[in-house]
Amino acid sequence: MNVQLNHTIVAAHDKKASAQFLADILGLEPSPPFGPFIPVQIPNGVTLDYMETDGDITPQHYAFLVSEDDFDTIFSRIQDAGLTYWADPYHHRSGEINHNDGGRGVYFQDPGGHYLEIITRPYGSGVG
């Protein structure tokens, strides 16, 4: 069976600003609007389709697997933007990165309150 994630909808109060935020942090470009969405396509073909809502937004979590070099670049953008970041999903280790499974990882939030994460090794893939 060949099943792949194609896209997910990301709720935002300002879809353009939220899509641009993700694109800027990851070094990507938003795609042209498609219906009510502003998609941001990541290199494996999956799109995060930003859609505006007036209601409350329940924060979701989106984790991105990146290379060691890309981690350095993205982490620099996070720091340059003055974003708060954490080594853990509970926000107990502010200003730190983690080294889970022999890699590096960090959590931060987008303007809509969604939890974003960059990791260099999939969790459960190596040494703790």
Task: Kindly give the residue locations of the regions a language model identified.
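N-terminal beta-strand motif that seeds the catalytic metal site of vicinal oxygen chelate
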Residues: M1-K16, H61-Y62, P122-G128
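Core segments of cupin and vicinal oxygen chelate
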Residues: N2, I9-L48, E52-G55
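Short glycine-enriched loop/turn motifs at secondary-structure junctions
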Residues: N2-Q4, G55-P59, H99-N100
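Residue-level marker for the onset of beta-strands and adjacent loop->beta junctions
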Residues: N6, P36, Q60, G102-R104
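Hydrophobic pocket/interface hotspot
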Residues: S18, L22, Y62, I78
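Short, flexible helix/strand-to-coil boundary loops that buttress conserved ligand/catalytic motifs
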Residues: L22, F75, T120
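Conserved beta-strand in the GNAT
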Residues: L48-M51, Y107, L116-I119
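Vicinal oxygen chelate
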Residues: F64-P111, Y115, Y123-V127
